Swiss-Prot record:
This is Large ribosomal subunit protein uL16. One of its GO terms (cellular component) is cytosolic large ribosomal subunit. NCBIfam families: rplP_bact (TIGR01164). Keywords: Ribonucleoprotein, Ribosomal protein, RNA-binding, rRNA-binding, tRNA-binding. GO terms for biological process: translation. InterPro entries: Ribosomal_uL16, Ribosomal_uL16_bact-type, Ribosomal_uL16_CS, Ribosomal_uL16_dom, Ribosomal_uL16_sf. It comes from Desulfotalea psychrophila (strain LSv54 / DSM 12343). Pfam families: Ribosomal_L16 (PF00252). Part of the 50S ribosomal subunit. Belongs to the universal ribosomal protein uL16 family. It comes from the Bacteria.
Length: 138
């Protein structure tokens, strides 16, 4: 699973997801991309599940770029624990996704294969997404 090698703080504030994505909203590497339409969090497991789906659909042809990284720790208290007594210990890592953020980019395959792979990957994610091409973004 994806996770940072070293972090400055073990636990972070929850934060609020407001506004659209400024960085990571334009095609940089591939010809086709999966774009988030609403805000949410992507766990490291969801990122990996969607990546595997894309690779299997493309039959290992072409190239895939992952444009998000889970850099925020998600904490959880143990089961059957009373409230209080501090914040729980870090359990997993999530990536904060805002509307307009590109999640995956694909190149080296035909258009119908790329669109099929990215749309199947969007089913693995907890928020709505759409497939964009270099032609539609210009």
């Amino acid at each position: 699973m994806l996770s940072p090698k070293k972090v400055k703080h073990r636990k972070v504030f929850k934060g609020r997801m407001r506004g659209a994505a400024h960085r990571g909203s334009s095609l940089a590497f591939g010809d086709y991309a999966l774009k988030a339409l609403s805000c949410g969090t992507m766990t490291a497991r969801q990122i990996e599940a969607a990546r595997i789906t894309i690779n299997r659909t493309m039959k290992r042809g072409g190239q895939v770029w992952i444009r998000v990284f889970p850099d925020k720790p998600l904490t959880k208290k143990p089961a059957e624990t009373r409230m209080g007594k501090g914040k729980g210990s870090p359990e997993s890592w999530v990536a904060i996704v805002k509307p307009g953020r590109l999640l995956y980019e694909v190149a080296g395959v035909s258009e119908d294969v790329a669109i099929k792979a990215l749309s199947l990957a969007s089913n693995k994610l907890p928020f709505p997404c759409k497939v964009v091409t270099r032609r539609t973004t210009l």
